[in-house]
Design a protein with these regions (language model features):
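Class I SAM-dependent methyltransferase Rossmann-like catalytic core
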Residues: 2-54
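Conserved class I S-adenosyl-L-methionine
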Residues: 58-67
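Conserved SAM-binding loop of SAM-dependent methyltransferases across substrates and taxa
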Residues: 68-81
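S-adenosyl-L-methionine
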Residues: 102-136
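A short acidic, Gly/Pro-enriched loop at the edge of an enzyme's catalytic core
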Residues: 135-146
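A short SAM/SAH-binding and catalytic strip from SAM-dependent methyltransferases
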Residues: 144-157
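A short glycine-rich, Lys/Arg-flanked "PGG" loop and its adjoining helix->strand segment in the class I
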Residues: 159-171
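Conserved beta-strand signature within the Rossmann-like core of class I S-adenosyl-L-methionine
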Residues: 172-180
Length: 221
């Protein structure tokens, strides 16, 4: 899911054969031998960006577009309490990967693997709630932290989940998510929904992003 984890030979194969053939045939060829270590190193860097902005004393985390959910392992270590994790993503592998921003984003996930990975890394199984984004979403807990890294607002409109967020989040909930810089050139639309927002990180790439922290979700519009 992350291009940063591709080896040089994989990048060459993707350019040579195209994204569709690469994704379905060649993606496991010439893979980095230490891919697991690199994945954790990548999300450790993500955690270091977030850690100074994380709220205190929370019980429930919602991760939208969780993928393998690795960031939640670092969040569990950060809080070191009996947190509950609600993980939303599509639960299928589509034939064609779409890069960048798309109204109908694609999926490359097996949520069973997500739950297995987290439970193997000191998160209790009973605290992992896997939610298929294509099905009805029911969350009976109050969420105090919402994260969405390179998903909501980056690959598809963040407004997609606003009705859910207004329903399940606390009044003091913290939201951390990525915005596609080319799509959201200013923050006027965000200011209609959040009382406070701040850019905490920017990434320049083919698909640049701004990571924002928001609070004060306005629920009556």
């Amino acid at each position: 899911q992350r291009n940063e984890l591709l080896s040089d030979k994989q990048i060459t194969n993707r350019k040579r054969f195209g994204r569709l053939l690469f994704t379905n045939i060649f993606i496991h060829i010439n893979q980095r031998e230490n891919i697991d270590d690199l994945s954790f190193e990548l999300f450790e860097k993500e955690y270091k960006v977030l850690k100074n902005y994380l709220p205190n004393n929370i019980s429930n985390i919602l991760d939208i577009g969780c993928g393998l959910g690795i960031i939640n392992i670092f969040l569990q270590q950060h809080y070191n309490t009996n947190l509950k994790f609600f993980l939303i993503d599509k639960n299928r592998v589509d034939l064609k990967i779409k890069y960048g921003f798309n109204e109908n984003y694609e999926s490359y996930n097996d949520l069973r693997e997500t739950k297995k990975l987290l439970s193997n890394n000191d998160i209790k199984k009973e605290n992992i709630f896997i939610i298929d984004a294509d099905k009805q979403i029911n969350i009976d807990y109050t969420i105090e932290l919402v994260i969405s890294l390179k998903s909501m607002g980056y690959h598809y409109p963040y407004e997609k989940y606003l009705p859910l967020l207004k329903k399940v989040t606390s009044k003091d909930c913290t939201f951390i998510f990525d915005l596609a810089s080319e799509r959201y050139k200013d923050f006027e639309i965000l200011k209609k929904h959040f009382k406070e927002l701040k850019v905490i990180y920017e990434e320049e790439s083919i698909h640049p992003l701004k990571r924002v922290i928001c609070s004060g979700l306005i629920k009556n519009i």
